[in-house]
Amino acid sequence: MLIVAKMVEEKFLQIDGHKIRYLESGNSKNTLVLLHGLGASAERWLNVIPLFSKEYTVIVPDLIGFGLSDKPHADYTPEYFIDFLEQFFEQTGITRPNLIGSSLGGQIAANYTSSHTDEIEKLILVSPAGAMSQSTPALDAYVMAALYPNEQTAKNAFELMEASGEEVPQEIITGFIGRMRLPNAK
């Protein structure tokens, strides 16, 4: 077990024989689950985990196929991710979580909630995928960075997505490149 950041614990479990990594922080009866977007990982939420963990037990999985979770050759359909969340919640003992999803994670959260309405306390969507009919420059840059992970493509993608105008931390760029170079990460 590794400490990823102050007060954030890294854990692993198995779903259908696949290793799933997740981060956990806080000690509350109220649970908040954060779902990352396409090509991202749990690290995408590191800056807000300490804030949320003051009020919630925060659980942040690397979705199956992403981050440091296994990347099986599978058909990554909405139903596949719904099944993943069902098993993840069951194995971690999570009941009636607050659920926040960003990008692809938002689409997964919305799909899950629509079929499990009585099992989610609150749903918050942050720029959910599936609502746009065309691409954007930021999405195009992100796809290029995922396909050709190097310092320049990653920095370009993250700079286009950074709304505050602040410089993207080097550990975000380095971590992204490392995860995109893992086997089956594309």
Spans of features found by a protein language model:
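Alpha/beta-hydrolase fold catalytic core
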Residues: M1-L32, K54-Y56, I94-T95, E159-A163
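Active-site loop/oxyanion-hole signature of alpha/beta-hydrolase fold enzymes
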Residues: I15, L23, V60-G101
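Conserved HGGG/HGGXW glycine-rich cap/lid loop of the alpha/beta-hydrolase fold
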Residues: H18-L68
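Conserved catalytic-core motifs of eukaryotic protein kinase domains, centered on the activation segment
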Residues: R44-L46, S69-D75, Q134-P137
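Flexible "cap/lid" loop of the alpha/beta hydrolase fold
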Residues: Q107-S115, I120-N150
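Conserved alpha/beta-hydrolase catalytic His-Asp/Glu region
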Residues: S133-A138, L147-K186
